[in-house]
Curated annotation (Swiss-Prot):
It catalyses: (2R)-O-phospho-3-sulfolactate = phosphoenolpyruvate + sulfite + H(+). Changing residue 137 to N: Loss of function. The lineage of its organism: Archaea, Methanobacteriati, Methanobacteriota, Methanomada group, Methanococci. Its EC number is 4.4.1.19. Catalyzes the addition of sulfite to phosphoenolpyruvate (PEP) to yield (2R)-phospho-3-sulfolactate (PSL). One of its GO terms (molecular function) is sulfopyruvate decarboxylase activity. This is Phosphosulfolactate synthase. Homotrimer. Belongs to the phosphosulfolactate synthase family. It is an enzyme of class 4 (lyase). The gene is comA. InterPro entries: Aldolase_TIM (IPR013785), Arch_ComA (IPR022370), ComA_synth (IPR003830), ComA_synth_sf (IPR036112). Pathway: Cofactor biosynthesis; coenzyme M biosynthesis; sulfoacetaldehyde from phosphoenolpyruvate and sulfite: step 1/4. Keywords: Coenzyme M biosynthesis, Lyase. Optimum pH is 8.5.
Length: 251
């Protein structure tokens, strides 16, 4: 039973995707006692899984699984394995480690649409939930993508079988994706995107509190948000529930 549970009202909470950059297993075990109910996915950032003892990776995944949380390795690790011609080995290792989902992306590399489609299919055929990511890691490359380009790729991935599509925002949330160089949401582009994709299938990377507030006020508490720092999960949950000044009386 939660403290002050008499204040709770039923509401539809969107997905919360947390970024794990190498948290210790025992920390994860204790940490989940505080916020495990509010996490849906955990991404082991970029290629961090490849530099940690595999038994530790498995231990952490099991702690997350105990809370019904799906874990997946960062898209950069997929891109690295794919560029080495080791996609099958990558999927096999993901299965052995206990990952239930994978991320297909081209943020640091170039993958054709056909290759992207086939990678999604192969991952799905191997029993994984598939999240894809739209956007480039380097701002100078990402800014070459128009909002129409992003919309087309989101719909392409969903048609190819992806379960969710993540909009690139990186850890900074500045000068990339739907954010300007100050980190403010590009409202005009967001409006166009919202009219042309299934928002319920889109996950917005929103590392900054101001961005989380903007998306919640725009779409409501059911908006899907990613790149949430492990120590910001409770903060985000209060924003979703109107238990913090930024959203009080507005959700």
């Amino acid at each position: 039973m939660k403290a002050f549970e008499f204040l709770y009202e039923d509401f539809q909470r969107g997905l919360t995707v947390v970024l794990d950059k190498g948290l210790p297993p025992k920390f994860v075990e204790d940490y989940l006692k505080v916020c495990g109910d509010y996490i849906d996915f955990v991404k082991f950032g970029w290629g961090t899984s490849a530099v940690i003892d595999r038994d530790v990776v498995k231990e952490k995944i099991n702690y997350y699984k105990d809370w019904g949380i799906k874990v997946y390795p960062g898209g950069t690790l997929f891109e690295y394995a794919y560029s080495k011609g080791k996609f099958d080995e990558f999927l096999n290792e993901c299965e052995k480690l206990g990952f239930e989902a994978v991320e297909i992306s081209d943020g640091s590399s170039d993958i054709s649409l056909e290759e992207r489609k086939n990678a999604i299919k192969r991952a799905k055929d191997n029993g994984f939930m598939v999240l894809t990511e739209v956007g480039k890691k380097m701002p100078d490359k990402d800014k070459q993508l128009t909002i129409d380009d992003r919309i087309k790729l989101i719909n392409f991935d969903l048609d190819a079988g992806a379960d969710y599509v993540i909009i690139e925002g990186r850890e900074s949330g500045k000068g990339i994706g739907l954010f300007d160089k100050e980190g403010k949401v590009k409202e005009n582009e967001l409006d166009v995107l919202a009219k042309n994709v299934d928002i319920n299938k889109v996950i917005f990377e929103a590392p900054q509190k101001s961005q989380q507030v903007a998306f919640i006020l725009k779409f409501g508490s059911s908006v899907n948000l990613a790149n949430i720092a492990f120590d910001e999960v409770i903060s985000l949950e209060t924003l979703r529930r109107g238990l913090r000044g930024d959203t009080f009386g507005k959700v």
